[in-house]
Amino acid sequence: MRNAAKALARGLALVVVSPALLSFAIRRAFMGPDRALEGSTQALAVIPGLVGQYLRRAFLQVVLDGCAASAAIEFGTIFSQAGARLDANTYVGPRCHLGLVHLERDVLVAAGVHVPSGGATHGTDDLDRPIRDQGGARALITIGEGTWIGSAAVVMADVGRHCIVGAGAVVTRPLPDYVVAAGVPARIIRHRRDEPARA
Protein backbone atom coordinates (compact mmCIF):
# COMPACT_ATOMS: atom_id res chain seq x y z
CA MET A 1 0.00 0.00 0.00
CA ARG A 2 2.80 2.41 0.93
CA ASN A 3 4.64 1.77 -2.35
CA ALA A 4 1.43 2.40 -4.30
CA ALA A 5 0.92 5.70 -2.45
CA LYS A 6 4.49 6.76 -3.24
CA ALA A 7 4.06 5.86 -6.91
CA LEU A 8 0.85 7.89 -7.04
CA ALA A 9 2.58 10.85 -5.36
CA ARG A 10 5.44 10.66 -7.89
CA GLY A 11 2.95 10.62 -10.77
CA LEU A 12 1.03 13.59 -9.38
CA ALA A 13 4.29 15.49 -8.84
CA LEU A 14 5.22 14.99 -12.49
CA VAL A 15 1.85 16.41 -13.56
CA VAL A 16 2.26 19.41 -11.24
CA VAL A 17 5.76 20.23 -12.54
CA SER A 18 4.80 19.84 -16.21
CA PRO A 19 4.42 23.64 -16.67
CA ALA A 20 7.90 24.10 -15.18
CA LEU A 21 9.23 21.45 -17.58
CA LEU A 22 7.64 23.24 -20.54
CA SER A 23 9.09 26.56 -19.38
CA PHE A 24 12.50 24.91 -18.98
CA ALA A 25 12.33 23.46 -22.50
CA ILE A 26 11.50 26.85 -24.02
CA ARG A 27 14.21 28.70 -22.08
CA ARG A 28 16.75 25.95 -22.81
CA ALA A 29 16.31 26.62 -26.54
CA PHE A 30 17.36 30.26 -26.03
CA MET A 31 19.69 30.16 -23.01
CA GLY A 32 21.13 26.66 -23.00
CA PRO A 33 20.37 23.92 -20.49
CA ASP A 34 22.49 25.16 -17.61
CA ARG A 35 21.13 28.72 -17.39
CA ALA A 36 17.59 27.44 -17.84
CA LEU A 37 18.16 24.82 -15.13
CA GLU A 38 19.41 27.29 -12.55
CA GLY A 39 16.34 29.51 -12.92
CA SER A 40 13.98 26.56 -12.73
CA THR A 41 15.59 25.08 -9.63
CA GLN A 42 15.50 28.49 -7.95
CA ALA A 43 11.73 28.56 -8.42
CA LEU A 44 11.26 24.99 -7.17
CA ALA A 45 13.69 25.46 -4.28
CA VAL A 46 11.23 27.55 -2.26
CA ILE A 47 8.51 24.90 -1.96
CA PRO A 48 8.80 23.49 1.59
CA GLY A 49 8.39 20.04 3.06
CA LEU A 50 7.66 16.68 1.53
CA VAL A 51 5.61 18.24 -1.27
CA GLY A 52 8.65 20.26 -2.30
CA GLN A 53 10.84 17.15 -2.24
CA TYR A 54 8.48 15.29 -4.56
CA LEU A 55 8.19 18.24 -6.97
CA ARG A 56 11.95 18.89 -7.12
CA ARG A 57 12.70 15.22 -7.69
CA ALA A 58 10.05 14.91 -10.44
CA PHE A 59 11.52 17.92 -12.24
CA LEU A 60 15.15 16.84 -11.82
CA GLN A 61 14.44 13.29 -13.02
CA VAL A 62 13.55 14.79 -16.40
CA VAL A 63 16.20 17.50 -16.76
CA LEU A 64 19.37 16.13 -15.12
CA ASP A 65 21.61 13.45 -16.58
CA GLY A 66 20.39 11.24 -13.74
CA CYS A 67 18.20 11.51 -10.64
CA ALA A 68 17.08 8.37 -8.82
CA ALA A 69 13.50 7.99 -7.62
CA SER A 70 14.86 7.60 -4.08
CA ALA A 71 16.89 10.86 -4.11
CA ALA A 72 15.79 13.55 -1.63
CA ILE A 73 16.46 17.23 -2.33
CA GLU A 74 15.59 19.68 0.44
CA PHE A 75 14.34 23.29 0.50
CA GLY A 76 16.56 26.00 -0.98
CA THR A 77 18.82 23.75 -3.06
CA ILE A 78 19.85 24.98 -6.50
CA PHE A 79 21.44 23.07 -9.39
CA SER A 80 23.48 24.90 -12.03
CA GLN A 81 24.58 22.09 -14.38
CA ALA A 82 22.25 19.74 -16.25
CA GLY A 83 25.04 17.13 -16.32
CA ALA A 84 24.61 16.47 -12.58
CA ARG A 85 23.67 12.96 -11.39
CA LEU A 86 22.09 11.79 -8.15
CA ASP A 87 22.16 8.04 -7.57
CA ALA A 88 19.89 5.93 -5.34
CA ASN A 89 19.28 7.00 -1.74
CA THR A 90 21.17 10.27 -2.02
CA TYR A 91 20.18 13.09 0.32
CA VAL A 92 20.86 16.77 -0.36
CA GLY A 93 20.18 19.02 2.60
CA PRO A 94 18.72 22.53 2.63
CA ARG A 95 20.35 25.52 0.93
CA CYS A 96 22.95 23.64 -1.12
CA HIS A 97 24.33 24.73 -4.49
CA LEU A 98 25.40 21.91 -6.79
CA GLY A 99 27.19 22.21 -10.12
CA LEU A 100 28.55 19.41 -12.30
CA VAL A 101 28.51 16.67 -9.67
CA HIS A 102 27.87 12.93 -9.46
CA LEU A 103 26.56 11.84 -6.07
CA GLU A 104 26.95 8.08 -5.91
CA ARG A 105 24.46 5.96 -3.99
CA ASP A 106 23.86 6.60 -0.28
CA VAL A 107 25.69 9.96 -0.23
CA LEU A 108 24.56 12.44 2.44
CA VAL A 109 25.09 16.14 1.75
CA ALA A 110 24.35 18.35 4.77
CA ALA A 111 22.93 21.87 4.76
CA GLY A 112 24.69 24.71 2.99
CA VAL A 113 27.17 22.60 1.02
CA HIS A 114 28.56 24.01 -2.23
CA VAL A 115 29.92 21.77 -4.98
CA PRO A 116 31.03 24.03 -7.83
CA SER A 117 32.12 22.37 -11.05
CA GLY A 118 35.74 22.03 -9.95
CA GLY A 119 38.24 24.59 -8.73
CA ALA A 120 38.81 26.40 -12.03
CA THR A 121 35.36 27.68 -12.95
CA HIS A 122 36.79 31.20 -13.25
CA GLY A 123 39.95 32.19 -15.09
CA THR A 124 42.26 34.52 -13.16
CA ASP A 125 45.50 34.69 -15.19
CA ASP A 126 44.85 37.85 -17.24
CA LEU A 127 45.33 40.81 -14.91
CA ASP A 128 44.02 43.25 -17.52
CA ARG A 129 40.58 41.61 -17.88
CA PRO A 130 37.81 41.25 -15.31
CA ILE A 131 37.62 37.74 -13.90
CA ARG A 132 34.03 37.39 -15.12
CA ASP A 133 35.27 37.83 -18.73
CA GLN A 134 38.05 35.23 -18.54
CA GLY A 135 35.96 32.09 -18.82
CA GLY A 136 37.02 29.00 -16.96
CA ALA A 137 36.86 25.23 -17.03
CA ARG A 138 34.26 22.91 -15.57
CA ALA A 139 35.10 19.50 -14.18
CA LEU A 140 32.82 16.69 -13.00
CA ILE A 141 33.14 16.22 -9.24
CA THR A 142 32.35 12.71 -8.01
CA ILE A 143 31.38 12.08 -4.39
CA GLY A 144 31.77 8.38 -3.69
CA GLU A 145 29.24 5.90 -2.38
CA GLY A 146 28.30 6.17 1.29
CA THR A 147 30.10 9.47 1.88
CA TRP A 148 28.86 12.17 4.24
CA ILE A 149 29.63 15.83 3.49
CA GLY A 150 29.25 18.06 6.57
CA SER A 151 27.40 21.38 6.71
CA ALA A 152 28.81 24.38 4.82
CA ALA A 153 31.61 22.39 3.19
CA VAL A 154 32.90 23.40 -0.24
CA VAL A 155 33.90 20.47 -2.46
CA MET A 156 36.05 21.29 -5.51
CA ALA A 157 37.67 17.87 -6.01
CA ASP A 158 36.59 14.22 -6.02
CA VAL A 159 35.82 12.54 -2.70
CA GLY A 160 36.22 8.78 -2.38
CA ARG A 161 33.79 6.18 -1.07
CA HIS A 162 32.69 6.03 2.58
CA CYS A 163 34.41 9.28 3.55
CA ILE A 164 33.43 11.91 6.08
CA VAL A 165 34.13 15.55 5.23
CA GLY A 166 33.89 17.85 8.24
CA ALA A 167 31.60 20.85 8.51
CA GLY A 168 33.09 23.95 6.90
CA ALA A 169 35.87 22.03 5.15
CA VAL A 170 37.15 23.13 1.74
CA VAL A 171 38.15 20.15 -0.40
CA THR A 172 40.72 21.29 -2.98
CA ARG A 173 42.43 17.95 -3.70
CA PRO A 174 40.98 14.48 -4.31
CA LEU A 175 40.34 12.38 -1.20
CA PRO A 176 40.81 8.59 -1.24
CA ASP A 177 38.25 6.08 0.05
CA TYR A 178 37.53 5.65 3.78
CA VAL A 179 39.04 8.86 5.14
CA VAL A 180 37.88 11.60 7.46
CA ALA A 181 38.96 15.06 6.30
CA ALA A 182 38.46 18.51 7.80
CA GLY A 183 39.84 22.03 7.67
CA VAL A 184 40.67 24.73 5.15
CA PRO A 185 42.05 23.34 2.96
CA ALA A 186 40.72 19.91 3.91
CA ARG A 187 43.34 17.50 5.21
CA ILE A 188 43.00 13.84 6.11
CA ILE A 189 42.78 13.53 9.88
CA ARG A 190 42.19 9.80 10.09
CA HIS A 191 41.51 6.64 8.12
CA ARG A 192 38.18 4.99 8.92
CA ARG A 193 39.49 1.49 8.28
CA ASP A 194 42.00 1.96 11.09
CA GLU A 195 39.24 2.65 13.64
CA PRO A 196 38.22 -0.17 15.99
CA ALA A 197 34.76 -1.60 15.36
CA ARG A 198 32.06 -0.20 17.64
CA ALA A 199 29.58 -2.47 19.37
Question: PLM features: residue spans?
Answer:
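A transmembrane-helix-recognition feature enriched in membrane-embedded lipid enzymes
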Residues: M1-S70
